[in-house]
Amino acid sequence: MMLAGKKMGNKLRANGNFNKTLISKLTDNIHEAMMMTSSLEEARMETKTLLYSSKKKNAMSHMTLKKLIEEHGTSSVAGLVSRENLIEAAFSMFPKSQIGGPREILIQSYKLRSHVRFFESLCEGLCMMHPKEMLTKGNKKENIQSSTSSSFKNELIYNKEKKRMMSLMPAIVADASRWAPSFTMMMFSYFLISLGLPSEIEDHCLAVLKAFSAKLIQLPDSLVEKWDNKSSLEIEAEEELQWLRENTMITRFVHRVMSGMGQGMLHRFSSLIHVAKDDILDELITMYLKQKNVDIKMVTMISSDDLLKQMLISGHNLKDMFESLVDILSIYEVTNMLSNIHTNWKKTSLSFNFNEFNSYFSTGKRATMA
């Protein structure tokens, strides 16, 4: 992570827009955070940033942040966070139904929202400078996916007819499993420090990560009511739920989580880490295949935990080219391990026919949404 952060920092600072991006994000306002549906305003937990209430209260984000703006007299994100002396990562939770089982959704406290907005806005600016990062590319990503496939196909034909070289067009399609829970704030901190950001920005970002290393989560009301009406001697059918019950502040129904970024919270920061890790992967693959007299071109698309790496592998020995595919997957898995990324091979494929990224399936210029 430190190597990836160092290389990423050097690459970003070499970009002529680096200082302009920092200035732009430091002068950003809080208005975009107001578009979020709701924020936690009161909770059944003892904190210094939220009012205590016997029942949690979620309020519309634009109303809670309006109060914060009136309190501090500024709508500048940097101005708001500089006037807060304490960052507490407090959340409420509710389950969201989806295919494959419900996903937990965390609602940030309204004061935390301004700090996360500052951090994520900065990371968004850095992501925009990296060609692999797709959260910031909008509707351009579909064109990148299709045009890359067509370009590689044309080059494959050219290599065969003009250079008498054989070529393969594989693609790694991956959706990481246990992405959010796997990361620790210590690991994030190493990466952040290695980026070499100005000390004032770095200090605040580290404070946000420190707060996230001890998140306070108010459990859903339905679960609270269930345990209120259930004897403490009665064991839960699911082992994970029983563990949660035993390790929760039972009088407040608050659980303290010591790791993980929080589902969808540090979205752009995790995407920045992923592209930095992938840059290291590309360097290792290119150096290794050069020793085997195999040429490779790669175009990678990344959005947080999703990845599509389209490749054009060319050479004169077909056996060496197929063997290199096994080596590429091995290097991919090892770099994932070194970055604490769990590779779920049920959701990872080496494809020769179809490419998929964010539910957009394509083969050449033909494509469809799932």
Which residues fall in each region the model found?
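Viral RNA-dependent RNA polymerase
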Residues: 1-370
